[in-house]
């Protein structure tokens, strides 16, 4: 059977379970779709995951980009057969107790293991690192954050990014310009951060600036309002995305929206209106998760925005390790030692409790 050539569209959707249904196959052939995000509900074991990703990639050319939230701690979608990754706050604790260089070395190992194991299963991208500062206010961020200190966050994220690159993956910093100061969970409410731009510049924006200079490939904005800067949430704001992120910071990479079904996005109107506002604000690619009915509503009469950079930006997010290369890495004693070391950093506190993040549960 001839594989259809369909340019990647600007929508990232999801699927229900372990295998594609015929309905999902038809949905994923729509020109509006360019990628898929997987969740825990899509994972049974490694062999099933490899079969699923191969099935997705065989649908069309260029292949759909496959992503996942696989940060470590309580946001690790695939467990059985994968190295258990520590929460990123573990690295912050090591930074404080053992020093910056030790923590950076550990962060690079985590990034390498994280990316290589996902690459071996046909995954292109993990939406990581979290660049939010841990102000002690936000339960949904909490131990997903490296540290409260902007320098520590930036340096640990850069080390993680270095490890991701060894495993064939690009980085995606989130949640611009910082979700750590607010109390609300933007999955459930629309939080407000009342600080001024100067206050944000002095702290939360610093890791994004540094990572942008050092090759961060993608950014995901927060569904948070910063009323002293703009009345719109950051992901819907031209001020935040076009003026501050693109012009002032000079970020050249991909802007992914956060999930447009989150409560923090719903106040903007129906799904078509949310999509329109996201694209006008400066998002390249939008996520619509856990609601295939909304994906179908969006697809109906969808006009692909004029974005001459879209094809190149999708291509940039492709995994850079071929199958043979990643299999060779996995067999090395050095990689296996890194797996064992990273697993030793994880703790029961990483795997149990805490706020659920982003799953339909």
UniProtKB/Swiss-Prot annotation:
Cytoplasm as UniProt keyword: yes
Among the Pfam families in the record, one is Glyco_hydro_3
Entry keyword Hydrolase: yes
Site Important for catalytic activity: give positions: 185
Q: Where is the active site?
A: 187, 258
What do the Gene Ontology cellular component annotations say? cytoplasm
EC number(s) recorded for this UniProt protein: 3.2.1.52
Q: In which pathway does it act?
A: Cell wall biogenesis; peptidoglycan recycling
Coiled-coil stretches are none
User: What's the chief localization of this chain?
Assistant: cytoplasm
Where does the signal sequence lie? none
Q: Which domain of life is it from?
A: Bacteria
Extract the InterPro entries matched here.
Beta_hexosaminidase_bac, Glyco_hydro_3_AS, Glyco_hydro_3_N, Glyco_hydro_3_N_sf, Glycoside_hydrolase_SF, NagZ_Beta-hexosaminidase
Q: Which SUPFAM superfamilies match?
A: (Trans)glycosidases (SSF51445)
Reactions catalysed according to its record: Hydrolysis of terminal non-reducing N-acetyl-D-hexosamine residues in N-acetyl-beta-D-hexosaminides
Binding-site residues for substrate, renumbered to this chain: 69, 77, 144, 174-175
Tell me the compartments it is located in: Cytoplasm
What are the protein's UniProt keywords?
A: Cell cycle, Cell division, Cell shape, Cell wall biogenesis/degradation, Cytoplasm, Glycosidase, Hydrolase, Peptidoglycan synthesis
The protein's name: Beta-hexosaminidase
UniProt source species: Neisseria gonorrhoeae (strain NCCP11945)
Starting at the broadest rank, the lineage of the source organism is:
Bacteria, Pseudomonadati, Pseudomonadota, Betaproteobacteria, Neisseriales
